[in-house]
Design a protein with these regions (language model features):
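Phosphopantetheine-dependent thiolation modules in NRPS/PKS and related acyl-activating systems
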Residues: 1-37, 41-83
Length: 83
């Protein structure tokens, strides 16, 4: 599964986006772009990514830049997986 597909799946489940998740691409804005994407959503998304990929995300790794777009979240995840 490609990273963007995995991120879409997590976003679909965490934010209850249903079929809308399929329309998300790398340039889709998360912060300010999806009404469902708030601070609680960040916690849900991070927890789901940690569980699904066996990674640990430290609080100091989280920033607005990570959650700006689907693509920025994918790059963050890829960096964690390559570490």
């Amino acid at each position: 599964m490609e990273t963007i597909d995995a991120v879409r799946s997590v976003l679909r489940d965490a934010l209850h986006l249903g079929e809308r998740a399929a329309r998300l691409d790398a340039d889709s804005r998360l912060m300010g772009g999806l009404p469902e994407f708030d601070s609680m959503a960040v916690v849900s998304v991070v927890t789901m990514l940690e569980d699904q990929f066996g990674i640990t995300v430290a609080d100091d790794e989280l920033s607005a830049e990570v959650f700006e777009t689907v693509g920025s979240l994918c790059r963050f995840l890829e960096g964690k997986l390559d570490a």
